[in-house]
UniProtKB/Swiss-Prot annotation:
Cofactor remark from the record: Binds 2 [4Fe-4S] clusters. One cluster is coordinated with 3 cysteines and an exchangeable S-adenosyl-L-methionine.
Name the UniProt record assigns to this protein: Ribosomal protein uS12 methylthiotransferase RimO
Chain residues that bind [4Fe-4S] cluster 1: C13, C49, C78
Catalytic activity field: L-aspartate(89)-[ribosomal protein uS12]-hydrogen + (sulfur carrier)-SH + AH2 + 2 S-adenosyl-L-methionine = 3-methylsulfanyl-L-aspartate(89)-[ribosomal protein uS12]-hydrogen + (sulfur carrier)-H + 5'-deoxyadenosine + L-methionine + A + S-adenosyl-L-homocysteine + 2 H(+)
Lineage: Bacteria, Pseudomonadati, Pseudomonadota, Alphaproteobacteria, Hyphomicrobiales
Organism this protein belongs to: Bartonella tribocorum (strain CIP 105476 / IBS 506)
Amino acid sequence: MVAPRISFVSLGCPKALVDSERIITSLRSEGYEISRQHQGADVVIVNTCGFLDSARKESLANIDEALKENGKVIVTGCLGADPDVIRQTYPNVLAITGPQAYESVIEAVHTAIPPIHDPFLDLVPPQGIRLTPRHYAYLKISEGCSNRCSFCIIPTLRGDLTSRPISDVLREAEKLVQAGVKELLVISQDTSAYGIDLKYLENSWKDRTIKTKFFDLCRELGDMGIWVRMHYVYPYPHVDEVIELMAAKKILPYLDIPFQHASPTVLRHMKRPALMEKTNRRIEKWRKICPDLTLRSTFIVGFPGETNEDFNMLLEWLEDAKIERAGCFKYEEVKGAVANDLGLENIPEDVKENRWHRFMAKQQQISTHLLKKKIGKRLQVLIDESQGKVAKGRSQYDAPEIDGVVHISSRRPLRVGEFVTVKIEQSDAYDLYGIAV
């Protein structure tokens, strides 16, 4: 008998990608086939994003496409937390569930097309099904967030911080390493708050007792002999402890910290930490401890009430801090966000656009200057793409999809997933160019 086929669309952030991997793993264990095409599938699952208006539009467009090409559609994810928005336009979807509603998604699939599975056939590898390339994987350590940033509705969509016990996280990490993963990208909504909700619950691991705590997690992952990269780190004081592990080469000297802005006034309106002078002193301290440290961050321009003075303060902070990687978003009003009700003046779209271009130009200058310093150095690079003797990879300074790459020429064919030493010969605003040695 032919196994039922599920087509799957995963939208949004890496956290949503991990949710998709979990759902697909459950479906495969029950005998469902996963298809890349809507046509011919028994049902389509769309894992949506609902954070920004642009993301909501993309989610609705994907639902529309799935309905036209297939007709049987199950919707899950963040946009599913607001089912009326979906039902008003697409009343014929089979089911709508919110984020993290794994069991509800599986039940909806069972209703649409019951599973057929030979219990003697193992369909899922120990590490589960992954949607990333085989050599790297996202490791989600918690769900939700207990911060209340005024522009964000994540706590409404996904609830307060809920950490996974550290033994569960480490078991998953170990299985991934055993499956050949070379790099773990640690993610959550608030990575450095890991374990606070569990009051740093103690677990047994390898005949030892360890705490469900950010530092302990970094230390244990650092002993697994692979690249470990930290994302979505809120700048709590205890982050300082982890810099020592980076200096000791236990985990990658890379911190993804979403600073969002530099103006104290804007940061207070955002309900974010507003002591950027103190943050600058901490960055200086971090770089003294770990000179190889790379900082990545994201920023928002055009937040309601942002003045020219506020924006210029952001540009000055960029020039002073000289962070290696920075992304910038033009503010979009998010339905349900507190920022909508602050009574602040909205910034015209043309002003937002101008500020975004000025921000990006400033960061390109900084990045160009910093990358030139890599010329002549030899870097360890993990290969992401290969066309024989020409390849692309990433050094410790770059996360997949959001940062730059290293373009490589080689005398021998290079394989995806292998580490190569590369001598850097050129650079531009974002990327490096070199020869495998």
